[in-house]
């Protein structure tokens, strides 16, 4: 019982084959530079990496090559593609159209295309992957799993923006939220670690990577999240500004004669901790510079830590407390100092970390708070691919029962 998980980028294709009985990854890889003169596939199976150079003009050629490798005598994990019970596609934006994973049909693809305005950089790539698979393996069921779907349970008073209501009605301008697959995985996983039902918990999950978002989860459902209409909103990130006074945009656009696209580039690619520090998009580099006395690097980290702690505090108010706080993704899993600094800012609430144990946890799964912390704090490495595989399996099985 195997599922292929696909994440199609504009010029890349990431994949995993997961055995659903053991939930182990049998093979995974990354196809890069699709559509360019030289394309490369890194394929990992049985702990060994294999690299291939092949010219893939488009996603269909890349997927055909990957599927051949998966049933290859030397590099494969299946005798035939018939062993696949389904293919799960990661889709960034489902708008208000999709509140849960769906079996992919021509009608579903058309509806996803309607959401492209909300995710012009991501949805078209996912569609390419779906359409290619429909041509190559038309008999294998496919499921679309949306990053935004988990947040469709956020109440209206929290997802509406305080601008004229007609903009929501005409253009769908509202908070959608992202990283939903990660937030859902971590919520269910930490409930397992605590030996409790996720429906009995109030969880605040901090997904901190190059991009980052905080999510308030109550009764297993998202009730608020920091990202908004796009992944630009919310906490300060590596190169993204996060929340700021909207007048900053109009001031800079007038002062520097910037158009909307140029302003968007500044906010998405030149801001965040990189913009403040002027050092790097990598938090580790900024930490090194801060430790050596660079004031702007230290300020960048302080702004980031304040930003995350502020959202955690906000969501404790929104839910009337929290039963657990979790850290996940690159910085959340491996940034021991950032975890400590964020929790130090929350000590008013009685939140503490075991400083020694926290420093020992780098990418591992464990509780990092002492027993006298008012709220337990966990590090839970995310696994979006496994969550997509689970959702794909569940969606297919439910469809078969109907």
Predicted regions: what is each one?
Residues 1-4:
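Extreme N-terminal starter segment of soluble prokaryotic enzymes
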Residues 69-84, 190-197, 312-323:
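Phosphate/pyrophosphate-binding loops at sites that engage ATP/ADP/AMP, CoA/4′-phosphopantetheine
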Residues 150-253:
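Glycine-rich phosphate-binding loop of actin/hexokinase-like ATP-binding domains
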Residues 265, 272-276, 283-318:
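Adenine-nucleotide phosphate-binding core of ATP-dependent small-molecule kinases
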Residues 298, 302-318, 323, 332-402:
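Internal helix-turn-beta structural module
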């Amino acid at each position: 019982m195997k599922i292929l998980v696909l994440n199609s980028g504009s010029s890349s294709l990431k994949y995993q084959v997961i055995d659903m009985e053991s939930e182990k990854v049998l093979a995974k890889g990354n196809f890069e530079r699709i559509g360019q003169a030289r394309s490369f596939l890194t394929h990992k199976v049985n702990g060994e990496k294999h690299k291939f150079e092949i010219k893939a003009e488009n996603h269909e050629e890349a997927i055909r090559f990957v599927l051949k490798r998966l049933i290859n005598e030397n590099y494969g994990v299946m005798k035939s593609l018939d062993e696949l019970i389904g293919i799960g596609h990661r889709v960034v934006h489902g708008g208000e159209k999709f509140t849960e994973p769906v079996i992919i049909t021509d009608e579903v693809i058309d509806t996803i295309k309607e959401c492209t305005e909300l995710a012009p950089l991501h949805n078209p790539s996912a569609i390419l992957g779906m359409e290619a698979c429909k041509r190559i393996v038309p008999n294998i069921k496919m499921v679309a799993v949306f990053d935004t779907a988990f947040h469709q349970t956020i109440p209206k008073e929290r997802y509406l923006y305080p601008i004229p209501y007609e903009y929501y009605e005409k253009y769908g301008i509202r908070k959608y939220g992202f990283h939903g697959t990660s937030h859902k995985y971590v919520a269910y996983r930490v409930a397992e670690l605590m030996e409790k039902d996720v429906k009995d918990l109030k969880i605040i999950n901090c997904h901190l990577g190059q991009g980052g978002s905080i999510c308030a989860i109550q009764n297993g459902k998202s009730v608020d999240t920091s990202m908004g209409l796009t992944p630009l909103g919310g906490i300060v990130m590596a190169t993204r500004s996060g929340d700021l006074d909207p007048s900053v945009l109009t001031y800079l656009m007038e002062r520097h004669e910037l158009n909307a696209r140029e302003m968007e580039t500044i906010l998405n690619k030149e801001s965040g901790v990189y913009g403040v520090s002027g050092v790097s998009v990598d938090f580790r580099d900024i930490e090194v510079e801060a430790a050596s006395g660079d004031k702007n690097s230290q300020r960048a980290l302080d702004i980031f830590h304040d930003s995350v702690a502020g959202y955690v505090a906000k969501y404790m108010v929104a839910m009337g407390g929290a039963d657990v706080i979790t850290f996940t993704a690159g910085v959340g899993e491996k940034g021991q100092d950032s975890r400590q600094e964020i929790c130090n800012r929350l000590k008013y609430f009685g939140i503490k970390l075991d400083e020694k144990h926290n420093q020992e946890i780098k990418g591992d799964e464990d509780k990092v708070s002492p027993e006298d912390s008012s709220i337990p704090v966990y590090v839970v490495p995310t696994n979006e691919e496994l969550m997509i595989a689970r959702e794909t399996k569940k969606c297919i099985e439910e469809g078969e029962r109907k």
